[in-house]
Structures are given as C-alpha cells and as structure tokens.
Design a protein with these regions (language model features):
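General marker for long, soluble alpha-helical cores
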Residues: 1-226
Length: 226
C-alpha cells in the first residue's frame, strides 16, 4: 500500500482495506485520476462499487463531482447511461440534481412524457413533481377536463389533494374557476356537499370565490345558529 501512495497506516486501517479488498491497483487507479483520498473515503468508495472507470466515465460527461458526490451518485444508481438519458430528454442537470432526480425515480421517459403534455419543468420542478406524485395519468386526467395548469399549479393541486373527481363535482354544480380558486376551494373544504347545503339555505348561484368566503365565515357549520 505504501508503494501505491498510502503510507503510515494503522492496523485498523489495514484491516479495513483488506476486508473491502482495496488493492494497490485500485489506489493507483484513483491517483491517476488526481484523487488522493484518505483511507475512510477509499473504503467508502470501494464498498459502494466506485471504480476508477466509473469516475472516468462520469468526468467524460462533463461532470466534476467531489468525493462525497461520487459516492452519492453510485449509491443512488446514477449511471453514465442515466445521465445521457436525462440529457437526451432535454435536461442539463448538475450533480446534486442528478442525485435528487434518481432518488425520486425521475426517468428519461417521465421527462419526455411531461414535455409531450406541454410542460417544461426544470430539474428542481421535476423532482418536486415526483415527490408530490404528479404522474402522467393525473396530468392527462386534468387536461381532459379542459384545464392546462402550470408545473407549479400541478404541484399545488397535488399537495392539496385536488382530484379529477373533485373538479368534476364543482363543474357539475355549475361553477367556473381558475386553478388558484380551485386550490383555495380545496384548502377551505368547499365540497359538492357544502355547495348543496348552501343552496338549501338560500345561498344559490354563488361563484366559487363567494362559496369560499361563505365557508370561511362558518355560518353553515352545524354549530352555527342558522
């Protein structure tokens, strides 16, 4: 190991290197890439299957991850093929974005499908969409109802639990609305049942904005004196 560039090793360090099958050739391969690492980092890389060849391929793609990022990329399965696929889909993410995208299950196919639906999310957007389960089926269902939300609106809708069924119920009540009003209505708990209850008490033909205001007043709550 001393000949490979690792000198003055403790017994524990030698044992760790031996257990993980860290060879002098492996160390030299890292050194040839300009990586002069401590024993703990070398062991971490070996445990995760980081090879000099992997690092070389990643750099060939124009990425310059640091030691921790290299390990993170390998742990999360960020392969050169994955990077190429994401780039071919129209993204140019940095290392941290690639790791986040892989963690959240962002695939090139998902990105292409979003673009086919007319959406143009950036790297951070697409991660948020995956986190909030904004899948292609959900997007298509919303589009089929005549709405074209932005990326941020889709994320907000999903966070607040706006479903196609909820939209249909509001439409069936004769309401028209934009995405902001729709999300506000969901937050405030304006439902088809509430709309029917309002009509029963004489609050008919209200706009969604007025229904939201009515819900906020609480005058139709069961405890209220109507």
């Amino acid at each position: 190991m001393k000949a490979a560039g690792l000198g003055d090793l403790t017994v524990d360090e030698l044992v760790s290197l031996k257990i993980q099958n860290v060879t002098p050739e492996y160390i030299r391969g890292l050194h040839e890439l300009g990586l002069h690492l401590d024993v703990d980092t070398v062991v971490s890389m070996k445990i995760q299957g980081v090879t000099p060849e992997y690092i070389h391929e990643v750099r060939e793609l124009g990425l310059t991850p640091d030691d921790d990022q290299i390990v993170g990329m390998k742990i999360q399965g960020v392969t050169p093929d994955y990077v190429r696929g994401i780039r071919d889909a129209g993204f140019k993410p940095d290392v941290d974005q690639l790791i986040s995208m892989r963690i959240q299950g962002v695939t090139p196919e998902y990105v292409r499908a979003l673009r086919e639906q007319g959406l143009q999310p950036d790297g951070d957007d697409v991660v948020s969409m995956r986190i909030q389960h904004v899948d292609i089926e959900y997007i298509r269902a919303i589009h089929a109802l005549g709405f074209k939300p932005t990326v941020d609106e889709f994320v907000s809708m999903r966070i607040q639990g706006v479903t196609p069924e909820y939209i249909k119920a509001l439409q069936a009540a004769g309401l028209t609305f934009d995405m902001e009003e729709l999300v506000d209505a969901r937050i405030q708990g304006v439902t088809a049942e509430f709309i029917a209850k309002a009509a029963k008490h004489g609050f008919k033909n209200l706009t969604l904005e007025k229904l939201i205001q009515l819900k906020q007043t609480g005058v139709l709550d069961s405890e209220a004196d109507i």
